[in-house]
A protein has these predicted regions:
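Membrane-embedded alpha-helical core segments of multi-pass
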Residues: 65, 118-119, 144, 150-154, ...
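12-transmembrane solute porter fold
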Residues: 11-28, 33-37, 44-92, 104, ...
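Short, charged juxtamembrane terminal tails flanking transmembrane helices
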Residues: 3, 461-464
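Short, Lys/Arg-rich, polar N-terminal cytosolic tail immediately upstream
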Residues: 1-9
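Membrane-embedded alpha-helical segments in integral membrane proteins
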Residues: 30, 34-38, 91-97, 147-163, ...
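Transmembrane alpha-helical segments of integral membrane proteins
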Residues: 185, 417-422
C-alpha cells in the first residue's frame, strides 16, 4: 500500500524536506545567471542576445525535461530520477565552473537545466500522489514558496559571489548543492509507489523550441535571416504538436488544450510568466548597464520585488477561493501595466526608489494573475485530465519564460548595438533600450488585461 505524507506515512513524510530542497536547488540554478548577462557578454565579446541563451536555452531544455519527467518517473522511479537530476546539476555546474569559453559555459547551463525540468515535475508529482487530499493544497503551496524563495535568493547570492569572486566561482554554489543533495539522498530517499510501463517517442524529444527562440532573439538585429529561422521554429513547433496528438503514448498529452476555457487560462499564465521572467532579467540589465551598479547591488534591488511576488501568490490563491477569477485577474494585469508604466517613466529620470517600488507593484500584479489563472484553467477540466494539464502548465511556463526573455533581451541588445554605433555612451544606449523594451512589455500587459476581462466575464456569466 502506498504511503502518504500524513499519519502512517512516516517514510513518505520524511522525504518531503529533501524534495523541497530539490525544488530550491532547481529554482536557484534557473535564475542564477539573470544578473550575470552583462559581465558574460563583455568577457566573451558576444551580444546580449547571444549571452541570453544562458537563460533562454536553459528554459527550453527545462521545458523538454518537464515533458520527459512523467515517462522517467513511470519507468525508472523517483529515486533514479532524483539521481539523474542531481547528477545533471553537478555535471553542468562543473562544466560551467571551468568553462574556458562561452560555448562550454552554455553547454554547462543546458546540462544544468535537466535538473530543473526533472525536479519541478517530480516534486509536484510526489506531492500529488502521496498527500492526503485535505492537505494537498498546503503541501503544494509549501513547494511553490520554496521555488519562490530560490528565485528571490539566487540573484542576491549570485550577485555577491560574482562581484566578489568572479564568474567561475558562481558555479561552485549549485555544485555544492548538488553534492549535498546526492549525499543525503543516497541514504534518505526511498522509492514510493509502483513503477509503470510505456515508451518514449525520440522524435518528440528532439523537436523543440530552439529555432523559435533564436529567431525572436535576433530578429531585431538581423531581420531577414532571423525571420527565416523564426518561421522554421514555428513549423517545428507545429510538427511537435501534431505528433503529440497522433501518438498513442505522447510525450506531452495536448488534448486538454481542446477545452477553450483551459486554453485561454493557460494563455493568461504564459503572458504573466513572460512579463515576470523578463522583468527578472531586464531590471538587472538596467541596473548594471544603465546605472553602472554591481551585480550584487542589482540582485539585492531585485530581491524585494520578487519576494512581494511570492507573497502575492499566496494572497491571490486566497482571494480566488473567496471571489473567483472576477475581478482578481483583470485587476492583476491592470496593476502590472501600471507598475511597468511607472518603471518606464522613473527609469528615464532616473528615480531609483520609484523604479524599485513600481517593479514591486508589477510583481504583485503578476502574483494575482499566474496562480489564479492556472487554478481556474485546471478547474475547467475533468479530474482525469489534471495530470496531463499540469504537465502542459509546467512546460508552458518554461516556454513562455524563454520566449519572453529572448524577445525582450533581443530588442534591448539590438538597441544597445545601434545606440553605441551612433556614438551614444554605453549607459545611455542601455537606458534607451530599456525604455523601448518597457513599451513592448506595457503593450503586452494591456492586451492581456483585455483578454482577461473577456475571459473572466465569460466565466462569471456561465456561473449564472
Amino acid at each position: 500500500m502506498r504511503a502518504t505524507l500524513e499519519a502512517g506515512g512516516k517514510e513518505a513524510r520524511a522525504q518531503l524536506p529533501l524534495l523541497l530542497a530539490c525544488s530550491f536547488a532547481a529554482s536557484f540554478a534557473q535564475s542564477m545567471m539573470n544578473i550575470a548577462l552583462p559581465q558574460v557578454a563583455d568577457e566573451f565579446g558576444v551580444t546580449l542576445s547571444t549571452a541570453n541563451w544562458l537563460v533562454t536555452g536553459y528554459m527550453v531544455v527545462a521545458a523538454t525535461s518537464i515533458a520527459l519527467a512523467a515517462f522517467l518517473l513511470r519507468r525508472l522511479g523517483l529515486r533514479t530520477v532524483f539521481f539523474i537530476g542531481c547528477g545533471a546539476l553537478a555535471l553542468g555546474s562543473g562544466l560551467a565552473l571551468f568553462a574556458p569559453n562561452f560555448w562550454v559555459l552554455l553547454a554547462g547551463r543546458l546540462v544544468q537545466a535537466v535538473c530543473t525540468g526533472l525536479f519541478y515535475s517530480a516534486v509536484t508529482s510526489f506531492i500529488m500522489a502521496n498527500s492526503d487530499p485535505a492537505r494537498r493544497g498546503t503541501h503544494l503551496a509549501l513547494n511553490s514558496g520554496t521555488v519562490a524563495a530560490g528565485l528571490a535568493v539566487s540573484p542576491v547570492v549570485s550577485g555577491l559571489v560574482l562581484t566578489g569572486f568572479g564568474r567561475h566561482a558562481l558555479f561552485a554554489l549549485p555544485l555544492a548543492l548538488a553534492v549535498l543533495l546526492l549525499a543525503v539522498g543516497f541514504f534518505r530517499l526511498r522509492e514510493v509507489g509502483p513503477r509503470g510501463t510505456g515508451a518514449v517517442d525520440p522524435l518528440s524529444v528532439v523537436l523543440g523550441l530552439g529555432a523559435l527562440v533564436y529567431g525572436l532573439g535576433e530578429v531585431f538585429r538581423d531581420p531577414l535571416p532571423s525571420l527565416a529561422v523564426l518561421a522554421a521554429g514555428v513549423a517545428v513547433l507545429g510538427l511537435f504538436a501534431w505528433r503529440q496528438l497522433v501518438l498513442k503514448d505522447p510525450l506531452l498529452n495536448l488534448r486538454p488544450l481542446g477545452n477553450l476555457g483551459f486554453a485561454v487560462g493557460e494563455l493568461l499564465v504564459m503572458l504573466g510568466m513572460m512579463a515576470s521572467f523578463s522583468l527578472s532579467i531586464l531590471l538587472p540589465l538596467y541596473y548594471e548597464g544603465a546605472l553602472g551598479f554591481s551585480a550584487f547591488l542589482a540582485g539585492a534591488l531585485l530581491a524585494g520585488p520578487v519576494l512581494a511576488n511570492a507573497l502575492s501568490d499566496v494572497v491571490g490563491g486566497r482571494l480566488l477561493d473567496r471571489w473567483g477569477i472576477w475581478p482578481l485577474v483583470p485587476c492583476g494585469f491592470a496593476l502590472t501595466a501600471l507598475g511597468l508604466a511607472v518603471v518606464a517613466l522613473a527609469a528615464g529620470r532616473p528615480l531609483l526608489a520609484l523604479v524599485v517600488l513600481a517593479s514591486a507593484v508589477a510583481y504583485v500584479g503578476l502574483g494575482l494573475v499566474v496562480a489564479p489563472s492556472k487554478t481556474t484553467a485546471l478547474s475547467q477540466l475533468p479530474p482525469s485530465l489534471y495530470a496531463h494539464a499540469s504537465s502542459i502548465n509546467s512546460a508552458f511556463i518554461q516556454i513562455a519564460s524563454a520566449i519572453g526573455s529572448s524577445l525582450f533581451v533581443g530588442v534591448l541588445s539590438a538597441d544597445v548595438l545601434a545606440g553605441t554605433s551612433r556614438g551614444l555612451a554605453r549607459a545611455a544606449a542601455y537606458d534607451a533600450g530599456f525604455a523601448h523594451t518597457m513599451e513592448i512589455a506595457i503593450g503586452i500587459a494591456a492586451a492581456s488585461l483585455l483578454v482577461s476581462l473577456a475571459y473572466a466575464y465569460r466565466l462569471r456569466r456561465r456561473r449564472g
